[in-house]
């Protein structure tokens, strides 16, 4: 198999078919509903903390880093519970928060920002690949599916082009959700790092939604959708490169945005119910200590919701 070098962006293709336009409208509708519900919450922090934890676990699971919620919460209480997989999940959470802070303060994303996010994930400063030899294989069969760019100059040029595309909406007159699908494919195809490409790419997804003002906080994550549709995810991703499958890839991502938006709305409502139940229990059993400040402090309590995370989901 030959080395595959993706075309630079914009693609200059007519890809917004009627089917894609319909799927885009539906995805926007559910995403807007999610944004509105999240913004109406009196305390967004507990929602963000819960969903970031779920994403850190799920995104790591795609890379065969398997943990449980109880293990994660125990590690938050005491370092004695930390193992290598738990540390990977914690690193992902730190990298995601770092990226969100960058978008909030800078309002754009640079190559150095992406390197910083990946460095937080992998705890190394290797930066972009400088040595050849990286290949992408089928995780089940071991078959080589893609040989990404090998020349460091190509990687640097493609990543410069990608961040320009991320930051400059005038480069292509596509809907932002369609562009997110293109950005995700492009990053995966470049595969600029030795390690952590998949998780870095999924962080870029949510940061792009915030950058485009489609969400105010990082609460929509496609990792659960990818886990449920893992074979389709890798097949469709590969088809973009070799079978002119960009339209099907975009439809897959738009469906994921719609599906996960609905699931996240349900999760937020469950969190609200849980908080109200907690409030009622405290008022009934410990009325002297109850206060609004106490209830809103729960997200900062180590181990909070360790017994309720399955109910929240």
Where in the sequence are the language-model features?
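FIC/Doc superfamily catalytic core
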Residues: 1-313
